Amino acid sequence: MTKKIGILVGSLRKDSYNKMVAKKFAELLPEGFESTFIKIDDLPFYNEDLEVEGSVPEAWDRFRKEVGEVDGLFFVTPEYNRSVPAALKNALDVGSRPMGSSVWGGKPGLVVTVSPGGPGGFGANHALRQSLVFLDVPTLQQPEAYIGGIMNLVDNDGHIADGTVEFFKTITDKYIEFFNKLVK
């Protein structure tokens, strides 16, 4: 049976490096796995007042359904002010509510942070992991995926350097091993 990996990209920018990286990770999934990109840019900010039957935003219902249908999760995000972008944090909140109905629990996760700077989104990576611990999303610990200096790893046509793709493949292979230990 094919396993489905949901990919959430924290950057909303059309020509985002994060989207390029996420697409490459999706391509590297082995046979028996497929990916789906889960849209977060249309989610109204979480507000508990909207959690009444008949008032729940349609985008929240769609998002929760899509996350609920996947077996594992890839989070690919930039770093904003040493944390994750508001759109991604909002997606985590929307998926975790109403209390007791979280769609996140038990789905193996991979955190990839992409940055033009040298630290490769270290702050966002760890801020996201902290939220994922609370949401019961076990995450791959090694190798860590900090993709720094991204502008030097992608050419003008959007092709990612071979050595970087090899690193992505190593990460993907380790994630699949991790996933298979957790999901039977």
Where are these regions (language model features)?
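A generic structural motif
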Residues: 30-36, 138
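Short hydrophobic segments within beta-strands
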Residues: 8-10, 38, 112
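Helix-loop-strand module that forms the ligand-binding subsite of alpha/beta enzymes
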Residues: 55-136
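A general structural signal for well-ordered alpha-helical segments in protein cores
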Residues: 18, 22, 60, 88, ...
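N-terminal beta-loop-helix "entrance" segment that forms/cooperates
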Residues: 40-57
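Glycine-rich phosphate/pyrophosphate-binding loop and the adjoining helix
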Residues: 138-184
